[in-house]
Structure formats: C-alpha cells, structure tokens
C-alpha cells in the first residue's frame, strides 16, 4: 500500500512504552513513502530519541495532572488551552492527513487540536487498562485500537508493535527443544530495575542452587549491590548487568523470564515465545496486572502480585516448572502474541487518511 505524499503526525511521549511502538509504526509507514513528524515535549525521552530515528519533532508544553497540588489543578485548564493552541498552530503548518495518538500527556491537546481542524484521529492504547488521555480522546477519535482486550469495550485488539529483532527469533519449539542443564532464568526489572526483584532473586538462587543459571538486569546504579547480594547468598556465579542492550539475544538465551509486566515487556515476551513469572508494579489502577492477565489465562505465565511476593513463592513456582512444562508455556505465549501488530496499526492509519 503506497503512502506517497501522505503526511502523518505521531503524538506520543513520556515513556518508552508510548514512544517505541510509535516509532515502529512511523518507520513502517515511512518505508511506504509517508512523511512523518512527531509531536512531543522537550523535557521527556522523545526529545532525544525521535530525532535519532531520523524523524523531525515539534514540541508543546504540557505535563501530567495526576498527583499535582491544588494550584496546578486550578492552572490546568489554561495550560491545556495553551498546549492545544500550540499543537493547532503546528498542525496548521504541517497539514497532516491523519494523527496517531500513542499515549502520554502530549496526545490530549494534540488530539483535540487535530479534531478541531477536521484531521482524523487514530488512537492506540498499549495497556490493558486505558490511560486518562486516551479515555477522553476515544470520544472524538476516528478509530480506537487496543493491545490487550478490556481497555475499551468495543475497540479492535491489534497487539503492541514489537521490535523486529524479537519477532525474528526462532519459534520456541526450534529454540528450546533439546535444551539440557540448569534452567536459564532471565530477570528483568525494566530500565530502572525493580528493587523488589533485586532483593528477592539472590535468595531465590540460594534456594534453587545449581538447578538454575540466572542473568539478572539490575537497572541503573544497582549492579554492584546485586552482585554482592548473590555472592552473600553463596551464588556468585550468576550474571548481573546494569542494562541489556540486545534484548532479543537475552530472550533467545532464556528458558523463562521473571519481570515486571509493562505493556511492551508483556508483548515482547509473547512475541519471543517465553514463559514468564510476572510481578506487576503496584499502580493505583493495577495497569500491569491487567497487561499480564491474558498470558496467565492462556497458560503461558503466572502472576505473583507484590504483596504476595516472597522468596518461597518465586522459588516454588520456578522449581515446579519442568522443561516440558516450560516448552508448552512458551508455545502458548507465542500463540497468544500478535506478531503483525505494527502492520495492523499502520493499515488503520492509512484507512483513516483515505476516508
């Protein structure tokens, strides 16, 4: 499908969970001849990341309202109005055929600006429970898509766009069949790490002994303390790294993952075809729990919520999964994934632009 001459504006910001899926769709459409610009904020990760991907970015001034004091709430209508006015001026100059909202505060005024100019608004919700901005914008959107069932009652489930190197991994039955020796446990707390996993997993390693080998991503500034915790637990042989640059290689190495359940993490693990033990971050709206639930229901994962998390709970769960069980779970994870999510979102953007 050629997009020669078509213009898209992507609205996404704040966290990797919003920005990376937006980049995947942007690159897919650019390969079809689309022009793409980005709407973001100057003080969040998109300001650096998006230009590195060869996409020009325009900035508006907006920040979140949750947890702010009374003064900020009183000033909010004026701030939103000003951000809407900035976004409207940017869109009048760029003249996009369609805008794609991938979440983050920037999508709110951006979506309203597009709607007020008669530009189609397409939304994608990455999480299992809809964010505040997308809940508002869904009322005026041309098309609403969701990664997991349940965020919106009637929206099409299209999955989350996932990195191509993860999608290119061999299927679980090719990758895991015939593996022997200690079970390979990949521990991932996200880029910031997860203190609870950093504290718990060295003790789990001590309980499981040589039945497992662990690769533990500790997050920024925690590598030394986590290495020390493994050593003090009598388990110095396990690998601890601050970051993992090549997640596809880490997934290829692993037999099972112990991790948080951010939207992209869950989608990547399903696409890779890996069993998982999820420890959702305790959001007020239990967002990460709802992200992980479809894989638990599919028999591909287990959820242990943080209040129930203990060394014994993790150790007993991992010890109870034989290699045969892990392979079955891995196959179920892959079967539950939506590997063509990027194409599905891109196709809806194209349709909205032609409508």
From Swiss-Prot:
It is found in: Cell inner membrane. Pfam families: Glyco_tran_28_C (PF04101), Glyco_transf_28 (PF03033). It is an enzyme of class 2 (transferase). SUPFAM superfamilies: UDP-Glycosyltransferase/glycogen phosphorylase (SSF53756). It is a peripheral membrane protein. GO terms for biological process: carbohydrate metabolic process; cell division; cell wall organization; lipid glycosylation; peptidoglycan biosynthetic process; regulation of cell shape. It comes from the Bacteria. Gene3D superfamilies: Glycogen Phosphorylase B. InterPro entries: GlcNAc_MurG, Glyco_trans_28_C, GlycoTrans_28_N. Its EC number is 2.4.1.227. Keywords: Cell cycle, Cell division, Cell inner membrane, Cell membrane, Cell shape, Cell wall biogenesis/degradation, Glycosyltransferase, Membrane, Peptidoglycan synthesis, Transferase. It catalyses: di-trans,octa-cis-undecaprenyl diphospho-N-acetyl-alpha-D-muramoyl-L-alanyl-D-glutamyl-meso-2,6-diaminopimeloyl-D-alanyl-D-alanine + UDP-N-acetyl-alpha-D-glucosamine = di-trans,octa-cis-undecaprenyl diphospho-[N-acetyl-alpha-D-glucosaminyl-(1->4)]-N-acetyl-alpha-D-muramoyl-L-alanyl-D-glutamyl-meso-2,6-diaminopimeloyl-D-alanyl-D-alanine + UDP + H(+). Pathway: Cell wall biogenesis; peptidoglycan biosynthesis. UDP-N-acetyl-alpha-D-glucosamine binds at residues 15-17, 127, 163, 191, 244, 263-268, 288. One of its GO terms (cellular component) is plasma membrane. GO terms for molecular function: UDP-N-acetyl-D-glucosamine:N-acetylmuramoyl-L-alanyl-D-glutamyl-meso-2,6-diaminopimelyl-D-alanyl-D-alanine-diphosphoundecaprenol 4-beta-N-acetylglucosaminlytransferase activity; undecaprenyldiphospho-muramoylpentapeptide beta-N-acetylglucosaminyltransferase activity. Cell wall formation. Catalyzes the transfer of a GlcNAc subunit on undecaprenyl-pyrophosphoryl-MurNAc-pentapeptide (lipid intermediate I) to form undecaprenyl-pyrophosphoryl-MurNAc-(pentapeptide)GlcNAc (lipid intermediate II). NCBIfam families: murG. Belongs to the glycosyltransferase 28 family. MurG subfamily. This is UDP-N-acetylglucosamine--N-acetylmuramyl-(pentapeptide) pyrophosphoryl-undecaprenol N-acetylglucosamine transferase. It comes from Escherichia coli O139:H28 (strain E24377A / ETEC).
């Amino acid at each position: 499908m050629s997009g020669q001459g078509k213009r898209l504006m992507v609205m996404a910001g704040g966290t990797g969970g919003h920005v990376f899926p937006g980049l995947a769709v942007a690159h897919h459409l650019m390969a079809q001849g689309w022009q793409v610009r980005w709407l973001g904020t100057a003080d969040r990760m998109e300001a650096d990341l998006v230009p590195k991907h060869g996409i020009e970015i325009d900035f508006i001034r907006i920040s979140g309202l949750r947890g702010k004091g009374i003064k900020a709430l009183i000033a909010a209508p004026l701030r939103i109005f000003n951000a809407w006015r900035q976004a409207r001026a940017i869109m009048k100059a760029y003249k996009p055929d369609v805008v794609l909202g991938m979440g983050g505060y920037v999508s709110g005024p951006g979506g309203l600006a597009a709607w007020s100019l008669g530009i189609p608004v397409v939304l994608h919700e990455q999480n299992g429970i809809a964010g505040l901005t997308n809940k508002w914008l869904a009322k005026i959107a041309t098309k609403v898509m969701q990664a997991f069932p349940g965020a919106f009652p009637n929206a099409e489930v299209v999955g989350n766009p996932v990195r191509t190197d993860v999608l290119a991994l061999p299927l679980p039955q090719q990758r895991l069949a015939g593996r022997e020796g200690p079970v390979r446990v990949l521990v991932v707390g996200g880029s910031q790490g997860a203190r609870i996993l950093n504290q718990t997993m060295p003790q789990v390693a001590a309980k499981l002994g040589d039945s497992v080998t662990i690769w533990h991503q500790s997050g920024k500034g925690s590598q030394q303390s986590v290495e020390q915790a493994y050593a003090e637990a009598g388990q110095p042989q396990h690998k601890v790294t601050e970051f993992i640059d090549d997640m596809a290689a880490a997934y290829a190495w692993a037999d099972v993952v112990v991790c948080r359940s951010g939207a992209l993490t869950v989608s990547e693990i399903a696409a890779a075809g890996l069993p998982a033990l999820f420890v959702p971050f305790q959001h007020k709206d239990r967002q990460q729990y709802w992200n992980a639930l479809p894989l638990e229901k599919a028999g591909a994962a287990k959820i242990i919520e943080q209040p129930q998390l203990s060394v014994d709970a993790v150790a007993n769960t991992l010890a109870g999964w034989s290699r045969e069980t892990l392979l079955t779970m891995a196959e179920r994870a892959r079967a539950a994934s939506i590997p063509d999510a990027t194409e599905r979102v891109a196709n809806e953007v194209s349709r909205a632009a032609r409508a």
